[in-house]
């Protein structure tokens, strides 16, 4: 992070990258490979501060320059996975929240404005927060051809003691409120449960997959986003 090269430039320099094999036939190997993305290391607090990786708002984080703090090992990762949507041309850039915007200006100056679509991931339990609005207004310009909000965790609203219609109405209200706040059509706000979609697919539980709402998101990606 002390260097001036952009991510785009570093992609042309194979020597700068570490390769981790992704064995899709082994759940254990897949888990280990994915866990490696979350690796951390300890460096001096001064270095972390200079790289913008020191959380000054956290009272538990030491401020002494000579103390050691934990920071992520990896700055950027590219994952090649043989999913049908990916093999058909879909590329997904996952930004790790608000901090990435300041630490990687390339994301906001080049990648996001030139994206075919931006999926803005929100929690249906919290809706659009103040910080969400700041990111949306500052970094997701109307010039992006497809601006889509995804309200995740709808399973938090599932309740066996409530009628299905009542739950559906509550989800619809949150969807409409998100549409209004972000100033995008209601059809561009999708309510899903990624966790239940995964469980349903693992178990072959079609009713759970249907309730998760994931099919609508997958159809949008396959039919509208892929060039």
Indicate where each model-derived feature is located.
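Globular "head" domains of long coiled-coil molecular machines
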Residues: 1-226
